[in-house]
Amino acid sequence: MYDLNYVKPKSTNDAVSEYQKSSEGQYLAGGMTLIPTLKSRLSSSDLLIDLSETSISGVTISGKTLNIKAMTTHSEVANSSDVKKSIPSICDLAGQIGDHMVRNRGTIGGSVANNDPSACYPSAILGLNATIKTNIREINADDFFVGLFETSLDEGELITEFSIPIP
């Protein structure tokens, strides 16, 4: 892994500000893909922006919409009573991801932002016609996923929440 700096901002605005100051900054959600990629020198960064202190975690229901914030861990999704009563298949999906260590650290936002073709969330987000909310816009799932490991996120754009219509 290359030498790099590390910050832990308290808000998404501060996280985006830190990103804009760096030449090769990367957001750190759960780190399940990013850290091994950096350690293997398949990617480099001059700054890791740890999102764990931001307030973008949790699950709510608003009318006929399930809202899952980006830093919600797989375990939190799997054990959420709101998810269980609205879209139980997402609980099942989240409860099958990796092992308990991955489920306790990995996040829905990191998984979707990475768009690994072997990941579970991207196909669920697409199939459920979710809306991906970022710090600057809302993107329909059909427009979000561009290709393998590719999304329509702009440079420095940060996923904050997923809004999923309850069937």
Go through each PLM region and give its residues:
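C-terminal structural segment of proteins
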Residues: M1-P167
